[in-house]
Design a protein with these regions (language model features):
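Catalytic cores and adjacent flexible loops of soluble metabolic enzymes
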Residues: 1-233
Length: 233
């Protein structure tokens, strides 16, 4: 076990309090388990979603424990080779699981040059029947990556948020509440400007008015009877 996890470990009472608070605020409770034993605790909680961390993406015993629960799964793919991703998707699909995968870079924080957001395009193309999201660890003050990810079609997002304490400062990849609000505003802006992408949209009246004022037309200087034939000359 990692020392940091042991130092911040929650007991059953703590978990009950945390999950109840999540539910009381009308949010979904999502949990990441790093060992099989933790799934015994998950079974006792009203959890909505199972998260598979990138470090556990190819951990077959852990994936098997997750798949045995009747819960949707979101799995991060950082560092996984193509064969592993193919196998995990096959594993979950063959068990009729509701699941999504996340483009993710396991570098904390992730420099802009290493974000590789075009991997979202790759994953969406290769696994066209699977929802693809974005789990991000960039500089907490950045709001650019979420906008690009939305423009590329990601529709599930994971962001680390933290509150500093006297004993534990915020790490270098987690946002504080103010930064999180800015991040959400950036996401909302991106969704608004991206608009609709699954059908042709022609309902902009101002656009139609502008085009009409610029388009060529045919006009008659004399009156003609109904049925009069007009030719190109």
């Amino acid at each position: 076990y990692i020392k940091r996890f042991q130092e911040t470990r929650l007991n059953k009472k703590d978990f009950d309090l945390l999950v109840n608070c999540i539910k009381d605020n009308n949010n979904f409770a999502m949990v990441t388990a790093f060992d099989n034993e933790s799934y015994n605790l998950i079974k006792k909680q009203p959890i909505d979603i199972i998260k598979i961390a990138s470090c556990s993406f190819g951990d077959w015993p852990l994936l098997d424990s997750a798949a045995q629960l009747d819960l949707p799964i979101i799995a991060s793919t950082a560092g996984a080779n193509l064969e592993t991703i193919d196998n995990v998707i096959s594993f979950l699909s063959n068990r009729d699981k509701s699941f999504a995968i996340m483009h993710c870079v396991a570098q904390y924080p992730t420099p802009d040059k290493n974000m590789n957001l075009s991997q979202i395009d790759f994953l969406k193309k290769r696994y066209s029947d699977v929802r693809v999201g974005f789990s991000t660890h960039e500089d907490p003050g950045s709001t650019d990556m979420i906008k690009i990810a939305i423009a590329k079609g990601a529709d599930i997002f994971e962001k680390h948020i933290a509150l500093p304490t006297e004993e534990y400062p915020i790490n270098k990849y987690s946002v504080n509440p103010v930064q999180f609000e800015d991040w959400l505003k950036a996401a909302s802006f991106a969704q608004d400007v991206c608009g609709v992408g699954d059908k042709r949209i022609l309902d902009n009246k101002d656009e139609q008015k502008s085009l009409k004022s610029l388009q060529r037309g045919v006009f008659f200087k004399d009156n003609f009877d109904t049925g009069h034939v007009v030719n190109s000359e």
